[in-house]
Design a protein with these regions (language model features):
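P-loop NTPase switch/coupling surface
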Residues: 1-170, 180, 188
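Extended helical coiled-coil dimerization/tether regions that scaffold
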Residues: 1-3, 155, 159-243, 247-264
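Short, charged low-complexity intrinsically disordered segments located at boundaries
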Residues: 75-84, 223-229, 267
Length: 267
């Protein structure tokens, strides 16, 4: 960012998106919980929120910090996507309004990228300000271009994380991580054990080693440490799901050691 100001999403407004009309809610400083019955679009909302920010940088596990909506959800050419109106407002750490992005949809099916989201700077909530001026302010104050993401490292954990390890063993690849790897150098193994054992006490022994798990059905690789009395491919969905969430937190933990780190977003 231009002056290294820390930004965070503070408000999400959905004027129109599929079955959502005139829906808006605040986003918490540290955590936001979206609840509801199955099939209403909760995962869609989370992925939309993740589409306004990102960083074109690889994590230690190989995934990037810039999730694309079309990688997880399909927008059909027959949809009225040009009429969708969604706005994400970002504030500085002290709550000072910073900028708003309209999540617009662009048809890139001819280039094989599908219909994807472009976060465009908007002047919707700024009195007496032209769109051009809003774009200039966002660029000068926060180094955010008119059609660019807000520079917050972002991870979206899709529901593919719930795919059971043992259901399709032939699509799962498990590789032990060497002791010289950055994960061990930065004590990520200790963090993994600590966080996992806080949720499910006495699950991972001190001598357990880190492995990298790649599922054919999941875009993100994850970390794994053997659980007491439970072979890797025999983990429950809940145990594996917890491991996936902690893996994402480890990605952020590793990123936090960079001098320029200024927060991250996990959806």
């Amino acid at each position: 960012m231009g002056v290294n100001k820390k930004l965070r999403p503070e408000h999400f407004s959905v004027e129109y998106f599929r079955n959502f009309k005139e829906v808006s809610f605040e986003l918490g400083r540290k955590i936001t919980v979206i609840s509801g019955q199955n099939g209403v679009g909760k995962s869609n909302l989370l992925s939309l929120i993740a589409s306004g920010s990102g960083l074109n940088k690889k994590s230690v596990l190989g995934s990037n910090f810039q999730p694309e909506f079309y990688e997880f959800f399909n927008v059909d050419e027959d949809e009225d996507f040009e009429s969708y109106k969604l706005y994400l407002t970002y504030v500085e750490d002290d709550g000072t309004p910073a900028l708003t992005k309209r999540l617009s949809f662009k048809d890139d099916t001819k280039t094989g990228r599908g219909i994807r989201i472009i976060p465009r700077t908007s002047n919707i909530y700024i009195d007496n300000c032209t769109l051009k001026q809003a774009e200039i302010n966002a660029k000068n104050e926060y180094d955010v271009g008119g059609a660019a993401r807000v520079k917050i490292p972002t991870i979206y954990l899709s529901l593919s994380r719930l795919y059971p390890l043992g259901e399709r063993k032939d699509t799962v690849k498990i590789t032990e991580i060497r002791k010289k790897n950055a994960f061990y150098q930065r004590k990520a193994d200790e963090k993994y054990k600590e966080w996992y054992n806080v949720v499910i006490p006495n699950s991972i022994k001190s001598e357990a080693v880190l492995s990298k798990v790649e599922k054919g059905a999941c875009a993100r690789a994850s970390l794994h440490m053997d659980i007491n009395n439970t072979p890797t491919l025999s983990q429950s969905i809940g145990q594996d799901n917890l491991g996936n969430i902690i893996s994402a937190l480890i990605d952020i933990y590793m990123l936090s050691m960079d001098d320029e780190y200024n927060g991250a977003l996990l959806c």
